[in-house]
């Protein structure tokens, strides 16, 4: 007997059973699932940190190994420093007492500067050393537009012998033109001291020797001038005495003076 139409419709209308979703156990909570994910993330971060720390440690060990000096290297460096110190002592023995004092002063000054730098930090105490100071000259009116910056002129920045000669030829006539003034002789010694104070003592001795030589030459010239002046004065006096004698012929007759013989009686 063929199946009825109703049976066929019933069979076609039956659907497969749905797949049951995973159900949470009674003893399982939502927080447990979240904790497991957090733990996984934390472990990954820890592994990355450990890898970076290991890399940094390996790098530091490599640098330390590269910088570490062997015993032979340390001995060689010690010998080099000792030889340099001995060479310096030999050089010091060849210098005279004045040069030694000047060198000691320079060393002491450099030491003081280094100590000051240590005290005051990174201040550059030497930045203005050797640097030309700005020298601005104003006219009598005080007008700033008429000011002249002498330090900017090439004349005042000599470097060669010829340039120093040019500077001397420019300044000497200007200064010596004031030599007849009373204050000139009082001003010049202090001016010379200021010009020479930055020189070593040996160079200052040379300057003093040159001035002594100049003084001796001037004394000879003055003595010679005095002798010549005395001779000229004596000659003028003699000529004056001779010229004062009268060359007039005496014509007075003394036998007829208006007096009789009885006047003497």
UniProtKB/Swiss-Prot annotation:
GO terms for biological process: formation of cytoplasmic translation initiation complex. Residues 46-62, 98-113, 217-229 have a biased composition (Basic and acidic residues). It comes from the Eukaryota. Residues 43-95 form a coiled coil. Its main location: cytoplasm. It holds the Pfam family eIF3_subunit. It is found in: Cytoplasm. Gene3D superfamilies: Eukaryotic translation initiation factor 3 like domains. The keyword Coiled coil applies. Residues 27-45, 86-97 have a biased composition (Acidic residues). InterPro entries: eIF3-like_dom_sf, eIF3j. GO terms for molecular function: translation initiation factor activity. Residues 1-113, 215-237 are annotated as: Disordered. Keywords: Coiled coil, Cytoplasm, Initiation factor, Protein biosynthesis. GO terms for cellular component: eukaryotic 43S preinitiation complex; eukaryotic 48S preinitiation complex; eukaryotic translation initiation factor 3 complex. Component of the eukaryotic translation initiation factor 3 (eIF-3) complex. Belongs to the eIF-3 subunit J family. Component of the eukaryotic translation initiation factor 3 (eIF-3) complex, which is involved in protein synthesis of a specialized repertoire of mRNAs and, together with other initiation factors, stimulates binding of mRNA and methionyl-tRNAi to the 40S ribosome. The eIF-3 complex specifically targets and initiates translation of a subset of mRNAs involved in cell proliferation. HAMAP family: eIF3j (MF_03009). This is Eukaryotic translation initiation factor 3 subunit J. It comes from Emericella nidulans (strain FGSC A4 / ATCC 38163 / CBS 112.46 / NRRL 194 / M139) (Aspergillus nidulans). The gene is hcr1.
């Amino acid at each position: 007997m063929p199946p009825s139409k109703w049976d066929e419709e019933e069979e076609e209308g039956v659907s497969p059973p749905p797949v049951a979703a995973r159900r949470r156990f009674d003893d399982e909570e939502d927080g447990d699932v979240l904790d497991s994910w957090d733990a996984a993330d934390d472990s990954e971060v820890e592994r990355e940190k450990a890898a970076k720390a290991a890399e940094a440690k390996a790098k530091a060990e490599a640098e330390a190994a590269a910088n570490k000096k062997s015993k032979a290297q340390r001995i060689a460096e010690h010998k080099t420093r000792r030889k340099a110190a001995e060479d310096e002592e030999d050089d010091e023995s060849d210098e005279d007492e004045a040069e030694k004092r000047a060198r000691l002063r320079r060393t002491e000054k450099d030491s003081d500067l280094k100590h000051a730098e240590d005290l005051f930090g990174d201040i550059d105490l030497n930045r203005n050393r050797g640097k030309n100071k700005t020298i601005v000259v104003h006219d009598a009116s005080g007008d700033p537009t008429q000011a002249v910056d002498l330090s900017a002129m090439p004349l005042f920045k000599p470097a060669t012998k010829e340039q120093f000669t040019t500077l001397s030829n420019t300044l000497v006539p200007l200064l010596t033109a004031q030599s007849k003034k009373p204050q000139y002789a009082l001003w010049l010694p202090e001016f010379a001291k200021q010009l020479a104070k930055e020189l070593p003592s040996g160079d200052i001795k040379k300057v003093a020797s040159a001035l002594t030589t100049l003084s001796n030459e001037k004394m000879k010239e003055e003595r010679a001038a005095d002798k010549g002046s005395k001779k000229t004065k004596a000659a003028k006096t003699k000529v004056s005495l001779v010229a004062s004698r009268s060359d007039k012929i005496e014509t007075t007759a003394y036998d007829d003076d208006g007096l009789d013989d009885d006047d003497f009686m």
